[in-house]
């Protein structure tokens, strides 16, 4: 447990907070690792089988109906639990092939990231995208190499791959013994102990550790002569040629501690969690329009990074997820809201274990809480007491896929419009309208194709509105930030279209990069942006 001043004080509560996101490529085992962290914390007693989700228990962090049907994480869940004196907030990001803006936004609320890598596949495309977002924020990144119970790449090759592809050096905290399907366990470099591999009851409950000192005369027999000799050679090579552990570099995001294990069998999960909590940082200062705001600033402040409607069909409600940046949150407190520039009362605050909720009396920097949203909150809104500070708006990432959507049943038009607007405000989709055309026809833009399927599913199940969808050829949207003439007088290629976004800002939809260049060359003084602020 961290050294803390007075229990219950702002400083003490902040010091024991850890807020992190798990990032990975699809099928690296992210939801499984999340489940196992909850298992070891005591938050759940048995872990649901992710692969056998239709017939077995559903994973705790996958709560939306479509996720349970497909066995994937579509939205980002926020979960809180206690372990060894720490208060932990996990942000579980989508792990399917077509991820959405939700994935990027969650990283804005995290203080550190756990990068999950499949031992057999190494660094993959989606991991690279998410890693870049983490590097931009300079947050600490911890690496867990998963699926060691199967044949995988040589660990030295994985380290080299991380440095060449991601540009970050790795320092193994433990080291695998056997990577060709003959996995025997890991060697913990800091304690000089070998933890022998035990698969337990297929990972449903906690595994009791079996540790053997490196100098134990029984070890060669336990591992076999070949693996024992290889381990001793690799330890020597690591000590001579490997990067030494430097906590300062880790906390700057310049060196990643590397762990090996098997989340599905629980092996290596507890040692990873223990060391992660020791090495990671408590909530840091956040930049605002009035300068840096330290976490222990007595004035309360936070920002909205996610909005989710209908998390529980029984409630039919809408929740805004807020990351607390400073001060103490208390139930029923009155705060200044940047979106309306008014004082509002925060009622019914909640914390989560996926879709299970608990009422919140108090919360501290680093915590994620859900606020009942009557329709006033927007992504990027700031909430605070004292000085009227604003945190940077969460950027709108340019969608890459577009479709024209309309209601099949004209009598359900009201539900259709309400559903599309609400999903747009959540950030699940982006909407665009052509000039002179009303809500009868809306252009929807998404970062990943699966979001179209999510849109159809949610409109049908939550709003009883079925839609007609026609794929459009556009692949780019650009926001007009400066124009030399009236918008309607701009010269555009025949395949490009003018439109307005949900905040009535002018945009151009393009089919290809050539059309973008043509527009810029034929309209001197025209300036286009790839992203837009949600505050503007």
What is the meaning of each model-derived region?
Residues 1-536:
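Structural and coupling elements of P-loop NTPases
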């Amino acid at each position: 447990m961290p050294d803390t001043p007075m229990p219950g004080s702002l400083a003490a509560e902040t010091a024991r907070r850890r807020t992190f996101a798990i990032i990975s490529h699809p099928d690296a085992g992210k939801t499984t690792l999340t489940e196992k962290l909850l298992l070891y914390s005591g938050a759940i007693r048995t872990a649901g089988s992710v692969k056998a989700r239709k017939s077995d228990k559903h994973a705790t962090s996958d709560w939306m109906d479509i996720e349970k049907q497909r066995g994937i994480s579509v939205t980002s869940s926020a979960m809180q639990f206690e372990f060894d004196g720490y208060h932990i907030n996990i942000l579980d990001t989508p792990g399917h092939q077509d991820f959405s803006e939700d994935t990027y936004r969650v990283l804005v609320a995290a203080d550190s990231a756990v990068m999950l890598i499949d031992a057999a596949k190494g660094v993959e495309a989606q991991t690279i995208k998410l890693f870049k977002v983490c590097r931009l924020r300079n947050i600490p990144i911890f690496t867990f190499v998963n699926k060691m119970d199967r044949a995988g790449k040589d660990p030295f090759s994985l380290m080299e791959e991380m440095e060449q592809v991601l540009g970050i050096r790795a320092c193994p905290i433990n080291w695998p013994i056997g990577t060709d399907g003959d996995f025997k366990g890991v060697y913990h470099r800091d304690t000089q102990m070998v933890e022998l591999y035990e698969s337990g009851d297929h990972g449903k409950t906690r595994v009791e550790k079996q540790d053997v000192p490196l100098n134990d005369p029984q070890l060669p027999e336990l591992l076999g002569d070949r693996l024992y000799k290889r381990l001793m050679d690799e330890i020597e090579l690591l000590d001579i040629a490997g990067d030494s552990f430097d906590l300062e570099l880790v906390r700057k995001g310049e060196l990643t501690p590397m762990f090996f294990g098997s989340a599905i069998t629980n092996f290596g999960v507890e040692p990873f969690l223990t060391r992660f909590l020791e090495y990671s940082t408590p909530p840091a200062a956040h930049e605002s329009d009035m300068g840096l705001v330290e976490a222990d600033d007595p004035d309360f402040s936070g920002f909205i990074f996610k909005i989710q409607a209908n998390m529980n069909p029984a409630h039919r409600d809408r929740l805004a997820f807020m990351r607390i940046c400073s001060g103490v949150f208390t139930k029923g407190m009155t705060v200044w809201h940047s979106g309306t520039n008014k004082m509002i009362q925060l009622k019914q605050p909640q914390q989560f274990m996926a879709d299970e909720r608990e009422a919140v009396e108090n919360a501290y920097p680093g915590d994620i809480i859900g606020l009942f949203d009557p329709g006033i909150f927007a992504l990027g809104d700031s909430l605070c007491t004292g000085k009227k500070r604003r945190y940077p708006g969460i950027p709108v990432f340019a969608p890459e896929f577009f479709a024209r959507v309309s209601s099949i049943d004209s009598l359900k038009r009201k539900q259709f419009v309400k559903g599309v607007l609400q999903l747009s405000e959540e950030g699940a989709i982006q909407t665009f309208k052509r000039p002179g055309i009303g809500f009868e026809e809306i252009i929807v833009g998404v970062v990943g194709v699966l979001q179209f399927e999510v849109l159809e599913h949610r409109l049908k199940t939550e709003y009883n509105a079925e839609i007609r969808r026609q794929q459009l050829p556009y692949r780019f949207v650009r926001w007009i930030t400066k124009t030399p003439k009236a918008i309607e007088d701009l010269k555009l290629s025949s395949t490009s279209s003018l439109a307005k976004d949900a905040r009535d800002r002018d945009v151009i939809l393009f089919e290809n990069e050539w059309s973008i260049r043509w527009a810029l060359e034929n309209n001197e003084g025209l300036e286009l942006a790839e992203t837009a602020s949600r505050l503007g």
